[in-house]
From Swiss-Prot:
The gene is HAC1. InterPro entries: bZIP, bZIP_sf, Hac1/HY5. Belongs to the bZIP family. Present with 8970 molecules/cell in log phase SD medium. It comes from Saccharomyces cerevisiae (strain ATCC 204508 / S288c) (Baker's yeast). This is Transcriptional activator HAC1. It is found in: Nucleus. Homodimer. Residues 41-61 are annotated as: Basic motif. CDD domains: bZIP_HAC1-like. Residues 117-134 have a biased composition (Low complexity). Its main location: nucleus. PANTHER family: TRANSCRIPTIONAL ACTIVATOR HAC1.
Length: 238
């Protein structure tokens, strides 16, 4: 015969041993919140948020103060370094300025000494190049200083023409050119010194009138003599 559930539970409870320190009071069941509790919790939440915001702002303020102090320290350090560099630069500039002034003075002294040496050299050259007249007393006649007159030049020209006419008159009339054979023409030209006519020419005794100036193109006698020449006279016809 089957046993019911109630019987089974009753038998099991009778068989179980319940400890003495067993918690008989159970916790209360979750109940609904009242309006006062909700308002209190809202106020607590607002205060908690405000406290967190204040802490974050204070943290940022402290960090900003730290950064400002650090920046000021770095600026002071940089200014001190810049002042030292400026002092060093000023010292270097003063040294370079002094060196430049010294070199400039030296260059000016060199230019002045060079100009003085050039002036002395130029004066010495000019004194050596100047002409110093000799102390000898040279007396010159006034006749030598005066130019020749036209009359003296005309008289000299007449004497020269008379001398030329005298030379031409002394030439003998029997002097004739030697006959040159056509076959021995080269021998006669090759040995001109063997001909007695060449001796007369060397002695300024020409067979024609020497008074005619062939180079003077204004002389009508020279022009007529030049016009009388023909090209056929210079060629030998066979």
């Amino acid at each position: 015969m089957e046993m019911t559930d109630f019987e089974l539970t009753s038998n099991s409870q009778s068989n179980l041993a319940i400890p003495t320190n067993f918690k008989s009071t159970l916790p209360p069941r979750k109940r609904a919140k009242t309006k006062e509790e909700k308002e209190q919790r809202r106020i607590e939440r607002i205060l908690r948020n405000r406290r967190a915001a204040h802490q974050s702002r204070e943290k940022k303020r402290l960090h900003l103060q730290y950064l400002e102090r650090k920046c000021s320290l770095l600026e002071n350090l940089l200014n001190s370094v810049n002042l030292e560099k400026l002092a060093d630069h000023e010292d270097a500039l003063t040294c370079s300025h002094d060196a430049f002034v010294a070199s400039l003075d030296e260059y000016r002294d060199f230019q002045s000494t060079r100009g003085a040496s050039l002036d002395t050299r130029a004066s010495s050259h000019s004194s050596s190049d100047t002409f110093t007249p000799s102390p000898l007393n040279c007396t010159m006649e006034p006749a030598t200083l005066s130019p020749k007159s036209m009359r003296d030049s005309a008289s000299d020209q007449e004497t020269s023409w008379e001398l030329q006419m005298f030379k031409t008159e002394n030439v003998p009339e029997s002097t004739t050119l030697p006959a040159v054979d056509n076959n021995n023409l080269f021998d006669a030209v090759a040995s001109p010194l063997a001909d007695p006519l060449c001796d007369d020419i060397a002695g300024n005794s020409l067979p024609f009138d020497n008074s005619i100036d062939l180079d003077n193109w204004r002389n009508p006698e020279a022009q007529s003599g030049l016009n009388s020449f023909e090209l056929n006279d210079f060629f030998i016809t066979s």
